[in-house]
């Protein structure tokens, strides 16, 4: 489906170059303007004001106005339960090319929230209740030409694109679920671009003149939950296990250096002081042994476990 408010399909629309947001993250994880040229927050931190870029048109030729953005946001909040998990507006007001979003409590990261593909801007004037294989009208460099769920999507150049003439006239996106199969398809020349490959596939393409490898720092954190029942109901055992886990070695050896040891739910790519955080359960095998000893656990056979 191409319904942007359903599950995470808005990511597909954005990745295909069709959808755009008011703001976006650059390759270094820093926020930058997109459909909004600039923004500021009120003194009481409750109202964010966005200046909508002049001269932008939807792919159908309709102008992008603050009123159009407001209507798109209202549709998103109406149809998506996830939207209020980012922030809950008490009002959205459009005036010319200025959009004001007010919340009951300060939301310091509201602009960052609007970079999520869920908040991509669509033209609601077509009054479509639900997009399935028919595509929403957006402002990106490409428009949907054909879409067959789980098989492929074809996009063509948006002649009304505000950011200059897109480089390719047409692009076909194939749905290849298996990462290894994607890598083989790229290697054979069946496809020209592949993303989200396994780290072990990287070595297959390194050093090849006709292959361009691009890497970006992720905005995601991966979290492993511990079972807090049974044997692991003892918090001392859980803490010892954490301190016995060499996350740095795991990231370097098993993930080929493509990950950073975590110490908080928020990754270092987001500006929340990750580098200043202290990991209370960093790798410390001696501390792990001490915790186990105090809790009454003994290494009866001397194998270190």
What are these regions (language model features)?
Residues 1-43, 74, 137-138:
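N-terminal lobe/hinge region of extracytoplasmic solute-binding protein
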Residues 26-30, 115-166, 170, 178-180, ...:
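Gly/Pro-rich hinge or "lid" segments in bacterial periplasmic/extracellular proteins
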Residues 37-79, 100, 232:
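Aromatic- and charge-enriched surface segment that lines or borders ligand/interaction sites
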Residues 40, 44, 51, 84-125, ...:
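Surface-exposed binding/hinge segments that line
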Residues 52-60, 89, 172, 227-231, ...:
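Second-shell loop/turn segments in exported
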Residues 91-93, 145-154, 172-229, 236-240, ...:
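Extracellular/periplasmic solute-recognition and catalytic clefts
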Residues 148, 244-275:
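Detector for C-terminal structural segments
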Residues 261-301:
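Structural transition elements
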């Amino acid at each position: 489906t191409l319904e942007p408010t359903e599950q995470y399909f808005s990511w597909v629309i954005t990745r295909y170059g069709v959808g755009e947001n008011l703001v976006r993250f650059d390759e270094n994880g820093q926020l930058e303007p997109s459909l909004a040229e600039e923004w500021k927050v009120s003194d009481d931190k409750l109202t964010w004001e966005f200046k909508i870029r002049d001269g932008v048109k939807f792919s159908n030729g309709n102008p992008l106005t603050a009123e159009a953005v407001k209507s798109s946001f209202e549709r998103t909040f109406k149809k998506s339960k996830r939207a209020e998990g980012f922030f809950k507006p008490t009002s959205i007001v459009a005036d010319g090319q200025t959009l004001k979003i007010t919340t009951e409590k300060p939301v310091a990261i509201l602009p960052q929230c609007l970079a999520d593909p869920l908040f991509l801007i669509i033209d609601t004037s077509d009054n479509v209740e639900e997009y399935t294989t028919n595509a929403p009208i957006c402002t990106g460099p490409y428009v949907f030409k054909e879409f067959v769920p789980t098989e492929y999507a074809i996009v063509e150049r948006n002649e009304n694109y505000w950011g200059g003439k897109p480089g390719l006239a047409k692009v076909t996106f194939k749905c290849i679920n298996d990462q290894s199969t994607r890598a083989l398809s790229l290697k054979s020349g069946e496809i020209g671009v592949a993303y989200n490959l396994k780290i072990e596939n990287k070595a297959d393409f390194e050093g090849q003149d006709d292959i361009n490898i691009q890497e970006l720092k992720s905005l995601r954190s991966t979290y492993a939950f511990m079972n807090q029942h049974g044997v692991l109901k003892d918090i001392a055992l859980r803490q010892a296990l954490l301190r016995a886990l060499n996350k740095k070695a795991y990231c370097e050896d098993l993930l080929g250096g493509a990950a950073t040891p975590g110490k908080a739910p928020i990754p270092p790519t987001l500006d929340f002081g990750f580098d200043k955080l202290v990991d209370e359960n960093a790798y410390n095998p001696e501390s792990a042994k001490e915790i186990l000893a105090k809790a009454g656990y003994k290494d009866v056979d001397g194998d270190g476990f």
